[in-house]
Amino acid sequence: RGHARAAHAGEAAGARLGGYGWISSGDGPLHEALLKICDLMNSRIDSLMTRIDILDLMNLLGTTLSSRRSDQIALMPAGDIEADEFAMAKKDCFTNGKHHRGQSNNSVMFSVKPSVAELRGLFATMEDAGGSEPGFINMTSAKVRAPWVSGFNPCAEQCLANKGVCNLSELVLTRFPT
């Protein structure tokens, strides 16, 4: 029952969700996300969605998931045609109307060792984008440690298999009777 209520958009904004202590955002974030998703889909009526469109779609959905921030990871292979745009996706996102892009941790995956010039370029991009993104992931090393790796949890602390589940959780000890 408590889990269904936490995911229910029908709770009034500001209502405390039983069993969790979270505060409901109401249906406002869902309404806003659906309008933006419709605009995004309509803008691509005559063409395929880009990877950046999919990033926006994923992050817009992420804004509706719960009454507190949800985390996603977005991964892009280094050298991809959209990698530069991806690397800068969060730049000024809180002032340019794309605040939903703040939902994901964006990382570039390297399957071969990058050159010093590539790393310098990546660090310059990180600095230009605000200082923290994109992250970069050494997929060769990850596959040595976990040959089945297909992705990672949002902060890239865990290697995950395809459709794998992150097992990190948070316990609020004050909610347990002593």
Which role does the model predict for each range below?
Residues 24-35, 51-55, 59, 116-120, ...:
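Conserved structured core elements
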